[in-house]
Structures are given as C-alpha cells and as structure tokens.
C-alpha cells in the first residue's frame, strides 16, 4: 500500500515540473495591437515566438482605470494563426475619455502589461448589403448600409472607399472616395468597358477619431453592357464600309455584265437597222499628221471602251476643239467679211430617217497642227496652198456674196434705172444691169463688165477693168449673170508692155469750140451720177503716178484710136499717123529727146512695112471695114470657128481671148442690150470704146500693124528699137537696155507734154451718153490672170489720166 502512494506522488511532481518548465519558455514578440469599433468591442492581437495554444496557456486581464472600484475583466485569447493570438474584449458604450489597463499572463507569469484607449484606436465596422442599381438609364448606382446608430459619434464621421475592378483582372480597378454622409455612389455606365464583368466592394474610416480603414465589405459582381456612341462606332463603320463598297462594286459590275450579255444584247437596236446610214468623209488633214487606226485605238483607254459598252445611252460623242492651220496667217481664205469663217470640226452622230428619205451626210473633219518647217518648206507650202485655193480645189467652199455686196448691186441698179428714165428712157432696164465678174481660170483675178448706153441708137460698148483677187466677197457668180445679160467682149489689151502704143487717133479732128470733149461730157455725167467720196474705201484708190515715157503716150493713142475707129475717117496710112503723133508730141514738149518729126534712123523700115499693109488693106476691104489705124490684137477670121494658133512674131502677148461660154454673146441678142461696165480706178475718167456696129471686122487692118509692132518692138526689153547714128552724140544721153542693145531715153516727159499728146480724142461717143458706176473693187490688190492662147504674165494696172480712154484686162 505504501508502494501505491509513492507512484502517485511521483506523477504529480513530474506534472508540476512540466508546467513550470513550459511556462517559462513562452515569449511575446512586440507589444500587442489593440483597436476598437467604438460601439461595443475592442480587439487585441499579438504575435508569439513559437506555436502556442493561446486558449490554454495565455490569459488577458483588463480593467477601466478611472474608477477605483472597477472590476477586473478577463479575456481568453484564441489562435488566429499558430503564432498569433486574438482576444475580443467587451466594452459598454465607450467614450473618448475611457482608458483600460491590460495584463497578459502565462499561468502564473506575466508576459506583457500596458494601457489602451478605444477613442485613439478606432477601426469601424465593415459596411454590408452592398447593392448595384441598373434602373438609371446612363449611370450605375451603388448603395450600402451604415452599421452605426444615429446617436453614435461615428454615424456622421465615416468616409467610404469604393473599389471597382474587372473580375478577370483585379489589377485593373477604379477607386471612388465617398466623403458625403449618404452611403451611395453613382458613376456613368460608359466609363467602364462594355461587355465586361466587374466587381465592387466598400470600406469606411473615421474622419475625427484616430484609427484605420475597416475591412472590405462583401463584393458584388455585374455584367457591364451599353450602346456605344456614334463617335466610338465610327472607326468600325468606316472599316466595314471600306470593305463592303469595293465588294459591292465588283458584284454590280459582274451582275450588269451578265444581264447585258443575256438580256440587253438580245434586244434589237436602231444601230443595227438598215434605216441608218452614215457616210464619213475622209478627214482633210496633212499627210504627215494622218494616223492609222491602230495608233488611234491605242490612245483610247480600255476602261473607256468598257464604259461605252456598259452605258451607251449615257455617253455623248466627243467634239474636238477648233484648231487653226499654221499657214492660216499667210494664206487667207476667200470669204465674205460679214460672215464668219468656215471652220471644220468633228461632228459624229447617228441619223435616223424613214426608208423614203434621202441619205444624210455626216461630215467628219479633223485638223492637226503641222510640224514646224524651215523657211524654204514654208515658201513651197504657201505656193501650194495658193494654188489649192482656186474654186476648183476649194472643195465646195466657193465664193459667197455678203449682204453688203447684194445691197451695193441693188443700189447700182436703182440709180441706173433712175438715170435712164431721166435721159429719155434708154430702152430696157437690162442696159443698166452690171454683169457679174467672170473669174479667171486660176481664181486669182476677175474681169468686170458694165453696160454703157451709147447715144440715141441705144448701142453699147464694153469696157473691162481689172479686179484683182482679194479675200473679200465677189459681186456675183458666172452662173447667175451669164444667162441674163449679153456681154460683148472687146479685144483684150495687155497692159504689161510699155512699148504697146498707138498713134492713129492723133489724126482725128479736134472737137468744136462750143462743144465739150467726149471725155469731159463723160466726166460731167459721172459727177452727176455718183460723186466720189473721199471717205469711201471703194471709190478711192492709190495716188496717180505720172506717165514715165512717150511710149505710154503712144500706147494710149492706140487705145483712143481703137475706140474712135467707128466714127472717124480712116487715115491714109500708118506712117503718116505716126509722123503726126510725133510732131504733136514734140510741139507740145520740145524738151523731150528722142521724139522728132522725121529722120530717126530707128524707123527706116517702117514705110516698107506700110506698103504691104496698104496692099493687104485693099484686098481685105471686101470683107472688113477699111481705114482703121492703130495696132489691135489678132482676131479670128471667122467668128464661129475656133481661134487660130498664136503667130510666132507676137510672142503670145497680143492675141485676144478665145470665145468661151462665160464671155461669149448668147444667140439672138440685140446689139443694144450688150452689158458693159465702166471701170474707174483711182478717180480717173475713162472714155468708152466705139459702138459695137462700128468696131472693125476681124483681119481688116490688124495683120499689117501686128507685123509693124513686132518689127519695131524688142521682145526682150519691150521698148521700140532705136539705133542712133553718130551725129546724135550731142543730144541727151541715151541708155542702152542690157542684153539687147536697144536705146531709150531715161528721162520721163513732163505732165504738159503728156496732156498735150492726148488732146486729140475720137468723136464717136455722143455727149448725151449716160455712164454708170461699176462695182467698186479695192485698187490696192493685184492678181494673176490666165486666158486661152496667152501665156501667164503678171498683170499690171495701167494708170489712165483724166480724159483718156483705156481698157485694162488681166
């Protein structure tokens, strides 16, 4: 029995030893941390150096210090972790002045001792009932509950912190501090990303009392979704549009192509109908600018061709701009000044008409600028273009009348009718009508005719005046004037040879003293009808140039003799006429050398030629009018036969134009209806030729005088052959022509000798003859005329002084 008591005492001793050994080994790491919720509970927490069972080994004793008789309160801690002990102490309605004394015991050993004030260490309670409201249209509303009563100090002293973060990425969050009293937070929906899950939580803290943030409230989660604004949807819309528009265009292209191939191409179109005809003329372009079809097709883009096929009804044909030729400046077209110039352009269109309508012509013209040429090529091109501007080569351009020309012709006809009625009514009004100018073969010069009544017998004479070609309009066309008026053509006289002279009219009798000269009567009539106006550009001409030599005086005498041959008696012979002309010229101007009555060795062969002329005149008197002196061009022996060949001794210069349908007399035309035109150049008065019935017959007296003229005239220089003897060395100097040896005086006669040599005038024109003004043509232009039987020679306008009658034809 004693043995049992010994075993019990040994066991109790070991237990006490273990307890003492164990209690001495617990150690607190630092001071405990205490904080209060300032409503009912204060919490203390401390850390130990080793794992300890807090509830069995440790004990916390605390008591209120301000009351002397306050009781000690004990708190049993618990383990929050293996080395962390937490103890929750109950406090009844704490105030700011409360202070507690605290002691930590490990069995019978004190581990820590200190004090704690609840108002200095406040940790508010975590909010609860966190809610998100979505009933607001554009904002989120987040609410929570305040756990402090209204009588508590922390009810109005708490601030809140709201944390909103993505559920999938908590590091991306947004924090809102709520400083107002109400436990709520409102934020816009679009501040968060749409289509994302978000979580929210809240914690509070006292603003007045010292303390820390409360624990986080339980979190809530929601799905954020809203309609994006337009500015945020614009990039997406632009991207989608950039992708959809090309796809749509491609779809439309292939769809329209498919539909056109299946449906549109199967519909009959007027373009394939036989009722349509298109005649395209070749483009009038230079050869170097013409392009082949392959070159033109390469310049037309392929996409335009496809567009033409897709939308044929919406496309219009192209019209090219007007272009001018580079040679338009030196070569001007012959057109009316009152009308705009004809400019070709490309006109390409389709014409529809019924089957019974004639085919229309669509003219397609294209102009290309010629490349730059040198000076010689430009001169050759100008010559070619001048030749191509003739009526035959103009290609339908033609000469057109302008309104001004038509009015001028009507005015002339009106004045002619009035003058005829005033002078006793000279038969028919056709005598006053002016014949249209007959264009020459080259289109560069024209001959104008005028009707000139000749006294009571109503005979008419013809005068031809040169009308050089110019860019202005012509007075008419041959097709209009030839059938209506009968124009008798006087033998043409070429005005290019200064040695072409006549002296037969020097023997004509002088007019009576009381009677005016025929040229003065004509001048009076012309002044009454149409006084020249200095402002009129048609009536005014270039200033008169004085006659340069006595040979021109002789030439005008020939013209006067041809005009007065029908009314004056025939002279005895050509040599006597020449002597009288020379005497008269020497008497009026004795200072002119080379003009002597007789004895000039240059005319010794003249009398022998006159003898043959007299014999021929006797033999030919049966068929012709004898006694007409002066040299005239050759005429056909038979009027209705073709003209004979040109004699060799005339050098092709002194023959008349062969009759043609344009200038021949129509059948059954009375001589009094001959259409003539009086040509006035530079204000000079021109005498009319003799009447048609007094004109000498062909080959009456012309052959002999032609031989005389050919013998006396040098065909190289155009002057009379004068070979002076040795005794003439003391007279005025004589100039020898280069290349032929003919001598001629280099001094020109004075104006007095010129007018004196022309005093004798024919009496064939009666004083009462009425004159009408010819259509006015510009006198500053010259042309080049060609006629059958004549070689082309440059035309020269002969300047005729006042009182002289001249016929100048180019």
UniProtKB/Swiss-Prot annotation:
Residues 460-482, 510-546, 586-672, 766-810 are annotated as: Disordered. Belongs to the type I cytokine receptor family. Type 4 subfamily. Changing residue 472 to D: In strain: BALB/c, AKR/J and SJL/J. This is Interleukin-4 receptor subunit alpha. The functional IL4 receptor is formed by initial binding of IL4 to IL4R. Subsequent recruitment to the complex of the common gamma chain, in immune cells, creates a type I receptor and, in non-immune cells, of IL13RA1 forms a type II receptor. IL4R can also interact with the IL13/IL13RA1 complex to form a similar type II receptor. Interacts with the SH2-containing phosphatases, PTPN6/SHIP1, PTPN11/SHIP2 and INPP5D/SHIP. Interacts with JAK3. Interacts with PIK3C3. Interacts with JAK1 through a Box 1-containing region; inhibited by SOCS5. Interacts with SOCS5; inhibits IL4 signaling. One of its GO terms (molecular function) is interleukin-4 receptor activity. One of its GO terms (biological process) is positive regulation of chemokine production. The keyword DNA repair does not apply. It comes from Mus musculus. GO terms for cellular component: centriolar satellite; extracellular region; nucleoplasm; plasma membrane; receptor complex. The gene is Il4r. Changing residue 193 to T: In strain: BALB/c, AKR/J and SJL/J.
